[in-house]
């Protein structure tokens, strides 16, 4: 049987953050391909201490994986929505059991936060432990592109088991193509507009005009050539966008993609590109 890991949580606080859109679309595609969801229900572990939360998540994953049999395949979207320090042990057990596991990578946390001086050492250590060991126990990996593949190979992952996705799907229910778009219209910026990810928004050049969509924008610092339209659910966002070209940019400078998130664009395929093309 072919499965995909479906993580379910009691509290979903990110409804208007497109961070879940890519994962949801992957699940939709896998469903259409005949994959079966292997559900993992995790309680609100934010109310637990660190040790209790780790034990709870490990037990939830272990319970789900016990349903898999020799010859089964499972696709896991990586990283897990909420990490488990013992995840690699579970993958090792699946391998011994004869279950084939595949990662579809959304982010490499060690790559994204390697230069983040504000991140506590214990969190960086956790990322290194959970990410590095897990990558070696799977049968195949879907990476973003050849640059990310190169990073994985440098980490010791066999190149022949890595496939490049190139770009994420952005599924739109009840799609209606817009016909009134003109290149002289404002530039679109959509996504997470918070200070730590998109500080460049407060130092953009005076031309052209920009239309902004997303969470975290500080309207009190809005520039004269910026129009903020608020935030929308991911499936509603494409029809709400007004403008010409979409801007794929992150970081604290409008001159170059700098900072933690700006540098990360060198390696990943931004989901914004999928949104704009859709």
Name these PLM-found stretches.
Residues 1-89, 95-102, 111, 115-116:
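N-terminal pre-catalytic "stem/leader" segment of glycosyltransferase-like enzymes
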Residues 90-100, 120-141:
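Membrane-proximal helix-turn-helix segments that form the acceptor-binding/catalytic region
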Residues 102-126, 257-260:
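Acceptor-binding helix/loop patch of EC 2.4 sugar-transfer enzymes
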Residues 109, 147-149, 194:
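Alpha-helix capping/helix-boundary segments
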Residues 113, 133-161:
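A short, active-site helix/loop in glycosyltransferases that binds the activated sugar's phosphate group
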Residues 147, 165-168:
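Carbohydrate-associated surface elements
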Residues 168-242:
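Conserved catalytic-core segment of nucleotide-activated headgroup transferases in glycan assembly
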Residues 239-278:
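Nucleotide-sugar-dependent
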């Amino acid at each position: 049987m072919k499965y995909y890991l479906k993580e379910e949580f009691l509290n979903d606080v990110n409804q208007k953050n497109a961070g879940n859109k890519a994962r949801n679309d992957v699940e939709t595609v896998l469903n259409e391909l005949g994959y079966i969801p292997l559900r993992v229900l995790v309680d609100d572990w934010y109310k637990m201490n660190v040790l209790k939360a780790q034990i709870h998540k490990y037990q939830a994953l272990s319970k789900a994986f016990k349903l898999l049999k020799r010859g089964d395949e499972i696709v896991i979207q990586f990283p897990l929505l909420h990490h488990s320090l013992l995840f690699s042990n579970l993958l090792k057990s699946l391998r011994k059991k004869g279950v084939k596991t595949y990662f579809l990578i959304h982010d490499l946390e060690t790559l994204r936060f390697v230069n983040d001086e504000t991140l506590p050492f214990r969190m960086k250590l956790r990322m290194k432990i959970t990410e590095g060991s897990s990558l070696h126990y799977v049968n195949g990996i879907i990476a973003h592109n050849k640059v990310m593949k190169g990073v994985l190979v440098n980490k010791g992952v066999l190149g022949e088991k890595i496939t490049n996705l190139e770009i994420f799907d952005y599924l739109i229910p009840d799609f209606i193509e817009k016909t009134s778009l003109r290149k002289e219209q404002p530039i679109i910026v959509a996504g997470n507009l918070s200070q730590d990810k998109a500080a460049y928004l407060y130092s953009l050049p005076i031309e052209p005009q920009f239309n902004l969509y997303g969470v975290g924008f500080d309207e009190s610092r809005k520039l004269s050539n910026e129009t903020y339209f608020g935030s929308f659910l991911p499936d509603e966002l494409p029809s709400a966008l007004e403008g010409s070209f979409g801007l794929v940019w992150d970081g604290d400078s409008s001159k170059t993609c700098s900072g933690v998130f700006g540098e990360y664009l060198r390696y990943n395929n931004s989901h914004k590109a999928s949104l704009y093309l859709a």
